[in-house]
């Protein structure tokens, strides 16, 4: 199973999962794709999730009122209590109806009517404010993708270890329990790969990996993607992450590395032979394997089978394609695009 965690623009698939799936399936490896990013946003705008949020707001408010009986609340908690009380008064059924209509607008021809599209986006934003109150002080957004858990820092390892267990602020933990773990229970994968391509995905990706390992310790969880590649040297110095948060890391490009990892886990090769892999052995020793760069002219086209096309917030099917990797120039001081690749610029032939 391959998982793409939040958050990314929910208008089209990110190319990582289809690119990996194409090579895995080419090698006879059954692969399930889960774009949890778009599934999360679709889930946010459902009556089931919004009623769940309502119950969480009520629970937080009750807890503050009970505390107030025995002690004086701090100014911050008193302000939170008032905010939660105010949001108890909103007409939730009205907003549930609005976002259901908004989803139809965003996914159909009415999207091209500017006033209707703006109305739909505002309907989403109103509901996101309600969700953010539930997870306060987190700020959860639909678009632009700028959500922030605020009390946790994504570049601090201690925070990454703590955040999966925060049931008050971490919305991604609830999404993992409601969407990810249920899918794993249904599909029963032997290996789960989580592609973390952007910094804003780090909290969600680490949360998913941790809770998957906790619920299914026998599943091999591997993480990869551009951000993981950038942090490879730091994670290699943190052996306590391996086995608890995830089992291995795949750096740089992962198409064939993931195939070789699956083969190694099934006894067909040694883990030491899997290029781009970082892992910890049974004795607790860390291993950073050699690197491998894909020949893009030999890669199959991306395989989108299994992507939830009906859930993307777009009136048309937007199919991404990548004809090149790396950068032919690579000297711009303001750009770090090349950090996700080993070195050279590569391009497919025009007929491909």
Locations of regions flagged by a protein language model:
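Structured core elements
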Residues: 1-2, 278, 288, 320-322, ...
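Glycine-rich beta-alpha loop elements in corrinoid/cobalamin-binding modules
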Residues: 7-54, 62, 70-71, 87, ...
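Aromatic- and Gly/Pro-rich amphipathic surface segment
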Residues: 58-85
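Extended, charge-enriched "interface" segments that sit outside catalytic cores
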Residues: 76-99, 104, 114-120
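A substrate-binding/cap region within the structured catalytic cores of diverse enzymes
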Residues: 108
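A short, sequence-level motif marking secondary-structure junctions
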Residues: 290-297
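Radical SAM [4Fe-4S] cluster-binding motif and immediate context
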Residues: 297-352
């Amino acid at each position: 199973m391959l998982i793409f965690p939040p958050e990314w623009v929910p208008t089209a698939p990110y190319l990582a999962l289809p690119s990996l799936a194409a090579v895995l399936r080419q090698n006879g490896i059954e692969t399930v794709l889960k774009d949890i990013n778009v599934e999360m946003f679709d889930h946010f705008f459902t009556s089931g999730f919004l009623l769940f949020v309502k119950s969480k707001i009520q629970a937080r408010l009750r807890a503050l009122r009970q505390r107030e009986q025995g002690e004086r609340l701090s100014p911050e908690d008193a302000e939170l209590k008032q905010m939660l009380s105010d949001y108890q008064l909103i007409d939730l059924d009205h907003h549930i109806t609005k976002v259901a209509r908004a989803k139809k607008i965003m996914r159909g021809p009415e999207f091209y009517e500017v006033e209707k599209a703006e109305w739909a986006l505002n309907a989403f934003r109103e509901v996101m404010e309600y969700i953010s109150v539930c997870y306060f002080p987190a700020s959860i957004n639909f678009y632009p993708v700028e959500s922030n858990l605020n009390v946790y820092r994504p570049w601090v390892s201690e925070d990454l270890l703590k955040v999966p267990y925060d049931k008050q602020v971490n919305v991604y933990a609830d999404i993992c329990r409601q969407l990810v773990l249920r899918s794993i229970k249904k599909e029963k994968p032997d290996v789960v790969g989580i592609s973390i391509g952007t910094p804003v995905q780090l909290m969600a990706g680490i949360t998913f990996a941790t809770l998957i390992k906790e619920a299914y310790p026998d599943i091999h969880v591997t993480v990869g993607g551009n951000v993981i590649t950038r942090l490879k040297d730091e994670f290699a110095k943190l052996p306590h992450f391996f086995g608890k948060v995830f089992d291995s890391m795949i750096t740089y490009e992962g198409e064939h590395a993931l195939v070789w990892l699956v083969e190694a886990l099934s006894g067909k090769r040694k883990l030491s032979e899997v290029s781009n892999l970082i892992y910890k052995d049974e004795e607790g020793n860390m291993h950073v394997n050699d690197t491998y760069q894909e020949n893009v002219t030999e890669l199959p086209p991306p395989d989108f089978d299994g992507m939830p096309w009906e859930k993307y917030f777009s009136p048309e099917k937007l199919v991404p394609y990548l004809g090149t990797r790396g950068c032919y120039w690579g000297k711009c001081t303001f750009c770090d695009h090349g950090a996700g690749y080993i070195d050279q610029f590569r391009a497919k032939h025009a007929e491909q």
